[in-house]
Design a protein with these regions (language model features):
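Ribonuclease/tRNase effector modules and their secretory precursors
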Residues: 1-121
Length: 121
């Protein structure tokens, strides 16, 4: 990928990758820590990737030609709260790299943007 996708296409592409039987997911350490901290599980991430929506513009990823997208969704384990997942898709590899997972209601109260977080670690 060399050009970022708009929100609608990003939603469709991420959902398509997430539903592909060849899907491979990697989790950055930060994402694994946030999942544990928030009491969320892998199936919550999969649900959000398969059924969520991208509403925000992407940010460049550290991997050249790739971009970070935030996909948002309520999940079976999140109660009435929505989660946001910052993900770097690699369509040709059928790979989704999870950078972080957040509660959107907490994110909206904090200055700054997690989508700007580095996806290196």
């Amino acid at each position: 990928m060399t050009q970022p996708w708009d929100a609608g296409r990003a939603t469709d592409e991420i959902r398509s990758i997430a539903r592909n039987p060849k899907l491979s997911i990697t989790y950055k350490l930060h994402a694994r820590e946030r999942l544990s901290e928030r009491g969320l599980i892998i199936s919550d991430v999969l649900h959000a990737l398969r059924f969520g929506n991208v509403h925000r513009a992407p940010a460049p990823a550290t991997r050249p030609g790739h971009f970070r997208y935030q996909i948002e969704c309520r999940t079976p384990n999140s109660g009435s709260r929505s989660i946001g997942i910052v993900v770097v898709p690699a369509k040709d590899e059928c790979l989704l790299t999870i950078v972080t997972v957040m509660w959107l209601d907490e994110f909206e109260r904090v200055a700054g943007s997690i989508i700007g977080a580095t996806d290196d670690g």
